[in-house]
Amino acid sequence: MKIGVYAGSFDPITKGHQDIIERALKIVDKLIVVVMNNPTKNYWFNLDERKNLISKIFEGSDSIKVDEHAGLLVDFMAKNSCNILIKGLRDVKDFSEEMTYSFANKKLSNGEVDTIFIPTSEKYTYVSSTFVKELAFYNQSLTGYVDDKVIVDILNRAKEYRG
């Protein structure tokens, strides 16, 4: 069984992330979506909330597991016997950054981790979690940018931020 890992902060998960997850399942048999905390980011949703948003979207899927990890991703992958890392790419900037990480992950894992890059579908190239949060903050429609199952959660959080 081929098990892949798709990691990110997912604050919140977008249709772009969802598209990468669904397309990754054409490559691997099982995908572990790993929610990570980046110490340089300020989050709208805490770790458990982000995991719950993802779980809500993929509820009932036997092919997707949602997990969390603090630390090096290669350590999580070794612990879970995974060697396929899935990365979505929106543009050349993403490619440049992720290519560097792929070399580092390969070295840190003693050659065990291979990174598979999946280009973002054209309709999601400009969609990011930051973009979604900005739309939500200004009470704009999130339809088409996030799954319908999580729109209310995101709009409610935006309302809290607006005060």
Swiss-Prot record:
It is an enzyme of class 2 (transferase). GO terms for biological process: coenzyme A biosynthetic process. It is found in: Cytoplasm. Pathway: Cofactor biosynthesis; coenzyme A biosynthesis; CoA from (R)-pantothenate: step 4/5. The gene is coaD. It comes from Fusobacterium nucleatum subsp. nucleatum (strain ATCC 25586 / DSM 15643 / BCRC 10681 / CIP 101130 / JCM 8532 / KCTC 2640 / LMG 13131 / VPI 4355). Keywords: ATP-binding, Coenzyme A biosynthesis, Cytoplasm, Magnesium, Nucleotide-binding, Nucleotidyltransferase, Transferase. Substrate binds at residues 9, 41, 73, 87. This is Phosphopantetheine adenylyltransferase. The keyword Magnesium applies. Belongs to the bacterial CoaD family. Homohexamer.
